[in-house]
Structure formats: structure tokens, C-alpha cells
Amino acid sequence: MGPSGSGKSTFLRCLNVLEDPTDGYVFFEGNNLCDLKVDINVQRRHMGMVFQQFNLFNNMNVLKNITFAPVHIGMQELRAAKLKNFKIKFLNLFKSKDKKQPVPPLQTSKKQIVEEAEQNAMRLLKRIGLEAKANVYPSTLSGGQRQRIAIVRALAMSPRVMLFDEPTSALDPEMVGEVLALIKELADEGMTMVIVTHEMGFAREVATRVLFMDGGKIQEQGTPEQIFGAPKNERLKDFLSKVL
């Protein structure tokens, strides 16, 4: 948390290298994301990102929005498996019978990839009570509905961490509660999350650790009890006096 322009969103975007850090490193599950040898796209598959403005694909219905990434990744993996098998078959042409390498069977198909992605999408939509909206387009939905679908879209990739960039800042006040309730559910289930937020009450209730940023630096960090109950940094004290 912190005032506008303090670097919160930039910090968040550096975590999955949507922004290149000017100094230092970002490690995710032992991998240095700033190392050019690391395939950042593979690492990003395990990071869900939810933006302020939803960033849904307006030319796709809700179901397509949710299944797009899982189907795309599934098809990439299927093509890689087919290419690997083709290489084995080709090399086997030049080997004697006793030295031919067995060709492993494909574990999936395009039809299966699409069906599994759609089943998972419908399960997630049912969880948030929006299964009836599967075939509608984002432009027909409320802000709260669009943001919940954006969260579900990220969850469809089974991420190991979720990054939220002010997920309620573009919502009408009465829509905020339904989005925060979903995020709280994820917290209760043990999902690792990094959330940029101005919802102080929510941060106090849900967070296990709070960072206060100002001027592009972390000025103070600690448990919610420490940050909200006994702040030490003068800038943090001033900030809390204005927002609480």
C-alpha cells in the first residue's frame, strides 16, 4: 500500500517482468527472472495477474476469455509432443530394428484440451455464480462481474501466485464487496497473493504481511498489527491518519 505514484504498481509489474527492474533480481521458485537464459513465458504460466481495468478480450465471450490461455498452452505442448515423436520416427528410419526408439503415445488431443479447459472454466464460473454469463461478451457485464471473471481467467491456469494491481480501483463502490469477497476466499484457501490496494480495512483483515511504499521505496513492512497498530515510519503515520 502507499500513496499514488509511490511505485506500487511498478513493483508488482517487476515481479513478473512486465517491467524490467533497473537494479537487483527477481527470484521465483529458485529461478532468476532477470536472467535472459530463463524462459520468462514458462515462469509466467504459474503467475496469475489481475489488472485495474480488467483487460478482458472484448471480441471473445466469457468462456473464450477464460479458456484462451489454457487451450493455447495445451496446444503448444501438444505440438511439441508431436514434433518430438516425428523426430523419433524419422531417426528410426536409419536404425536397425533392435535399436529403434519406441514412440510414446500422445497423452491428449486438441478435442480433449478444449473440453477440459471448458469444463474447468464452467466450474470456476459456477463458483462465482456467473455460469449463466458464459456465452455473453464483457461489454454487457458490470464492472464487478468483469473483474471477477478476470480473476477466474487467471485462476484457470492454476497459478502458484496471484498478483493483483488495485483490483477494485475501477469499480463503483457497491461493486467492491463482491470482488474483495472472492479474493478473501482465495486467501482463506491458502493462495499466495501480492495485492496492491487502497482498501485499508481489507488489507488489515486479509494480509499476513503489509508493505508501505513511498517515493519508489519500501518505507516500512510488517504484520497488519504492526503496520496499522504501531507504525514507526513518520510518513506511514501521516498516510494512515488521512486514509483511516
Residue ranges and their predicted role:
Residues 1-224:
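ABC family nucleotide-binding domain
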Residues 221, 225-244:
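C-terminal boundary and immediately downstream tail of ABC-type ATPase nucleotide-binding domains
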